[in-house]
Amino acid sequence: MRKIDIFDTTLRDGEQSAGINLNTAEKIEIAKQLERLGVTIIEAGFPASSPGDFDAVHRIAETVKNSVVTGLARCIQKDIDTTWEAIKGAQQPHIHIFLATSPIHMEYKLKKSPEQVIEQAVEAVKYAKKYFPLVQWSAEDAFRSDREFLVRIMNEVVTAGATTINVPDTVGYASPYEYGALFKYLLENVKGADKVKFSAHCHDDLGMATANTLAAIENGAAQVEGTINGIGERAGNVALEEIAVALHIRKDYYQVETGIQLQEIKRTSQLVSKLTNVVIQPNKAIVGRNAFAHESGIHQDGVLKNPETYEIISPALIGEGEIPLVLGKHSGRAAFRDRAETLGFDLSDEKLNKAFVEFKKLADRKKEITEEDLLTLLTEQQIQLEDVPLFELKMVQVQYGTENIPTATAIVLTPEGLEKTVVATGAGSVEAIFNTLEQLVPNAVHVIDYRVTSVGKGRDALGEAVVNIRYDHVSTTGRNSSQDVLEASAKAYLNAINRHLIKESLRAHPV
């Protein structure tokens, strides 16, 4: 059966979504989960774009062992050099270089003739091959490019040593029939097409990314690129979970396999949603909250008699199911460590100890500790960066009443090691807390977005607060969870400030 490689670009193309801002620890955590999911290639970032991206790609390349790690680069020698420095520690060094090929891009963006574009692409591939055994070349905006020109330039880059040719529908303009036909044409006309892999990369501007990707597979694509939950610029990329499940459920038709561990899909989706702060729409295919819900009485009756009457996908297939009671307040450190490892967390002793302390606090207050609670608690510990002095909330107290002005008092340990007490009022309890904590930093903090969601069910569920701020003209998002939503809100606000400090430290001391 033909094998389709899954190329995940959640950490590169996905992170280009408006409002997404991942730090290195979060990217590493997502990369490790993508490895557990079984993706063939992880595009970890664009190393030449910033010190932060370089650091993330470098560390992911050294961490991930069972998936190929790649970095994006323009067809520029400096970009390729930087990507090699970031990727060279990987098991199989891989680079993804790109150059636009559509008339509108060549004329207005590149300001180059078709011949100059071919020359630049060939030189870049030859240069990259000096470092990398695996070189993927992308024809940016391929679908809107002239077909004959695509054949010309692809002939040259294949001869130069490219091992994969990517054919992106960069602006999501294609229809399934047209996109499939383009693959058929290229595979029939590019010299040496049988010696390289052709890859599909679809955007969802017209809502056809999944259909277009499947059409490419039907017409010979050997690799598909996309993101978890379909995140990405504008309307997003193709959702890889949709492709993986569609190819599995309709294996009778497509006759291909992916190597994806389908039972890891739900956990991967939840992790990406949590760390990117992008909420999954309830009716999202495969991973939405309502994906397996039946409201109609006729449907419910049928499912009760035989689930296959209305369910073509078993919830268990993607790791969906009842969240069991896993630990309680009498559970010991060894059991906690074992459960953390079962859930896929490889925490340092220090982080495990901190997580265990938080677990015991929660267990004393909460009747039942669910797997979802543990995932939230362990994720928060795993993504903490400890190499930069940060603010730490020691205490927060709010005085509130319908006839009183809300007043917040906080005691905070500053990055300099000083304990500082701050007080402020606000129109409500949350604003009072934010106004109080804003006094800790020299410049104004603008809260762009704030929300609290429930983790799990019941009146004793954890509340997860997410705060998106703009400070020094830079947007940063913080998060925290607690049974007390005011405490969670205060810690989320400080988490956003701390993430800004980490960014500034990295900018001042690049890797």
Curated annotation (Swiss-Prot):
Database matches in InterPro entries: 2-IPM_HCS-like, 2-isopropylmalate_synth_dimer, AIPM/Hcit_synth_CS, Aldolase_TIM, LeuA/HCS_post-cat, LeuA_allosteric_dom_sf, LeuA_bact_synth, PYR_CT
Pathway: Amino-acid biosynthesis; L-leucine biosynthesis; L-leucine from 3-methyl-2-oxobutanoate: step 1/4
Keyword set, alphabetical order: Amino-acid biosynthesis, Branched-chain amino acid biosynthesis, Cytoplasm, Leucine biosynthesis, Manganese, Metal-binding, Transferase
Cofactors named for this entry: Mn(2+)
Region annotated Regulatory domain, chain positions: 392-511
Chain's role: Catalyzes the condensation of the acetyl group of acetyl-CoA with 3-methyl-2-oxobutanoate (2-ketoisovalerate) to form 3-carboxy-3-hydroxy-4-methylpentanoate (2-isopropylmalate).
Protein name: 2-isopropylmalate synthase
Originating organism: Lysinibacillus sphaericus (strain C3-41)
